[in-house]
């Protein structure tokens, strides 16, 4: 929903704008003035301060940022500010839906023992940060992959708490202007690569490679630290969703994404993880400090929901090997629980146990009546995740999986282009799937041709497809050294399970809200008809643009594919966002990807790049 429509002349618009701004500032002062925390958390970018953005390349943006913020662009009857205010520097790492200050201000009554304070709590539109998030002092363009796996700029994530706290575990080490990652972890001080090989050896996988000749492709690492486990699995063609909350281990997911490793901010609390059932072949917890016995095994049952038939759970923790009374008691209770869940010990050696989930429903059906935990209700949807609470029950397999005694997935990489078994759940045919795959391959080739003057082989690493559908955009990038976070809306067909069945990863998300990631974490955003979609929901295009700017790294790219009228509206914000046009191309309405266009309106591919800028305060601090 675009803001600021104008019905009168320029003079009237200016007077009206000034009055509205004055009233709004007064409202903010009265509303937040009583709370020092609220005032410091919002400040609306220090009210309406000027950007003061000096480009590190020496470009002053043609002096446009020196103009008064209240000057409006009246073209096509839309009044749009030529510059957005900049949020206070202290908010350079704000995550709107995971903002502890917002929780305090709203006095939300959350159960800390259930980790509710680490779950999503999104501000209403009137309390959003409608300002640009500044990079921290001394920010530099991130180090390119694959070098970034082992080192990042310290200025980009100025948090050295973990380096000191975990100094004996080789998580990360300060080295001058950089932070290096030796590959260690709490349980694998001598390197994740050796630890991974040892697990593969325990499971008798060929050549001590955990991918089991392509049969093991998707992994969930809970309590992942700085994601070194997932980083070293990439060499084996294993895609890991590294998951952790933004807790006392400051910014661990931010470090992971800065390194170019797939990661997501999330927690095993009260809500289901944002993944469909049967998404992962392997789950991992290395001293993740999770009480798996709480609430009748609720958290372990959530892992069970997202594991595929025959999937593994590797658990490296004192409970698995320590001989003191407390740990022996926990081990006994945990062993009894997983036995009732029909898991079996695949192997137990040294400090690690690996359990395996059954291949079919046979064991569930053979349990004694009244055995806990029970099977979930037959009418329960195991794939519904948006705002759905976890349940302490076992998710049985579908008739297809029970009959085939497994997921029926092809090994990787054939899995990427093979028709997923769950395709029939949506009434899609194999022909539709193959055509979609080929169409997006052509489109991605076209995108890269349009960006050829700007994009080299290592320019982008972290990519997000904001409307992934069946994941064919990501599939088309298989030969590039990138990874894709595939996002599927909770309002449409839940095709995220098809994406996981292709050996890709993703999450469920509504773009009327902020995404669960730190600022400056993605190199490229692909927005296919996202703006048209949110407009139909009555949500703000301006809010989405500001959110995309928050997510996007400086020098990163946005590919917008939408109606021409929508793209023309977006163009009015480029100067305010400090984005510049890279390429623009009309799309034929006969394209099967763009058939929703009304009245024969052409769709447009519009590609922009975010400039690198710092606030004047940050520049002074870095001198």
UniProtKB/Swiss-Prot annotation:
Lumenal topological domain: 35-623
Keyword Transferase: yes
GO MF annotation list: methyltransferase activity
Cellular component terms (Gene Ontology): endosome; Golgi apparatus; Golgi membrane; Golgi trans cisterna; plant-type vacuole; trans-Golgi network
Keyword terms of this UniProt record: Glycoprotein, Golgi apparatus, Membrane, Methyltransferase, Signal-anchor, Transferase, Transmembrane, Transmembrane helix
Domain of life (superkingdom): Eukaryota
EC code: 2.1.1.-
Coiled-coil blocks: none
Chief location: Golgi
InterPro entries found in the cross-reference section: Put_SAM_MeTrfase (IPR004159), SAM-dependent_MTases_sf (IPR029063)
A biological-process GO annotation: methylation
Regions that span the bilayer: 14-34
Glycosylation sites: 204, 350, 588
Entry's localization field: Golgi apparatus membrane
Topological domains, Cytoplasmic: 1-13
Presence of keyword Mitochondrion: no
Membrane topology: Single-pass type II membrane protein
Enzyme class: transferase
Entry similarity comment: Belongs to the methyltransferase superfamily.
Protein name as it appears in the record: Probable methyltransferase PMT8
Originating species: Arabidopsis thaliana
């Amino acid at each position: 929903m675009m803001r600021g429509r104008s019905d009168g002349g320029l003079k009237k618009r200016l007077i009206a704008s000034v009055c509205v701004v004055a009233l709004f500032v007064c409202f903010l002062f009265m509303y937040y003035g009583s709370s020092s925390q609220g005032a410091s958390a919002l400040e609306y970018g220090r009210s309406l301060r000027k950007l003061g953005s000096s480009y590190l390349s020496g470009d002053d943006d043609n002096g446009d940022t020196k103009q008064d913020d209240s000057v409006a662009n009246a073209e096509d009857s839309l009044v749009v500010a030529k510059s957005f205010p900049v949020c206070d520097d202290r908010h350079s790492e704000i995550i709107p839906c995971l903002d502890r200050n917002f929780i305090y201000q709203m006095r939300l009554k959350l159960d800390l023992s259930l980790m509710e304070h680490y779950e999503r709590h999104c501000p209403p539109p009137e309390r959003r940060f409608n300002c640009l998030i500044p990079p921290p002092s001394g920010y530099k363009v991130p180090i390119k992959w694959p070098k970034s796996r082992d080192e990042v700029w310290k200025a980009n994530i100025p948090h050295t708490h973990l380096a000191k706290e975990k100094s004996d575990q080789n998580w990360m080490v300060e080295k001058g202007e950089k932070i290096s990652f030796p590959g260690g972890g709490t349980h694998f001080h001598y390197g994740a690569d050796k630890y991974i090989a040892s697990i593969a050896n325990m499971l008798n996988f060929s050549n001590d490679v955990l991918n089991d000749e392509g049969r093991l492709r998707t992994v969930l690492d809970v309590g992942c630290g700085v994601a070194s486990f997932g980083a070293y699995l990439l060499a084996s063609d294993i895609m890991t969703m590294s998951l952790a909350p933004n807790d006392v281990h400051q910014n661990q997911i931010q470090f992971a994404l800065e390194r170019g490793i797939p990661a997501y901010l999330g927690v095993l609390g009260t809500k289901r993880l944002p993944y469909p059932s049967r998404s992962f072949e392997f789950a991992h917890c290395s001293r993740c400090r999770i009480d798996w016995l709480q609430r009748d095994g609720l958290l372990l049952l959530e892992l069970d929901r997202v594991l595929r038939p025959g999937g593994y759970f590797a658990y490296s923790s004192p409970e698995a090997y320590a001989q003191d009374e407390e740990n022996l008691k926990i081990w006994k209770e945990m062993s009894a629980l997983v036995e009732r869940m029909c898991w079996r010990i695949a192997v137990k050696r040294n400090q690690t146990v690996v359990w395996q989930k059954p291949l079919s429903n046979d064991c569930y059906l053979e349990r004694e009546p009244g055995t806990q935990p029970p099977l979930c209700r037959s009418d329960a949807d195991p794939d519904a995740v948006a705002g759905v609470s976890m349940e302490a029950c076992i998710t049985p397999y579908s008739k297809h999986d029970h009959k085939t005694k497994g997921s029926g997935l092809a090994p990787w990489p054939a899995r990427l282009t093979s028709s997923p078994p769950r395709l029939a759940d949506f009434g899609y045919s194999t022909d539709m799937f193959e055509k979609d795959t080929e169409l997006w391959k052509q489109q991605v080739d076209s995108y890269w041709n349009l960006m050829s003057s700007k994009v080299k082989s290592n320019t982008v690493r972290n990519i997000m497809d904001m409307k992934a559908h069946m994941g064919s955009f990501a599939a088309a990038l298989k030969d590039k050294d990138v990874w894709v976070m595939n996002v599927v809306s909770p309002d449409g067909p839940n095709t995220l399970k098809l994406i996981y069945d292709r050996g890709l990863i993703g999450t469920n998300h509504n773009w009327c809200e902020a995404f669960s990631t730190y600022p400056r974490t993605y190199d490229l955003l692909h927005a296919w008809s996202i703006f048209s979609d949110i407009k139909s929901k009555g949500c703000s295009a301006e809010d989405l643009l500001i959110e995309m700017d928050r997510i996007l790294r400086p020098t990163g790219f946005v590919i917008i594919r939408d109606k021409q009228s929508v793209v023309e509206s977006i163009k009015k914000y480029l100067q305010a966002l400090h984005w510049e046009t890279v390429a623009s191309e009309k799309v034929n309405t006969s394209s099967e990807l763009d058939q929703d266009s009304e009245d024969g309106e052409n769709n447009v591919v519009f590609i922009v790049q975010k400039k690198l800028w710092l606030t004047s305060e940050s520049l002074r601090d870095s001198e």
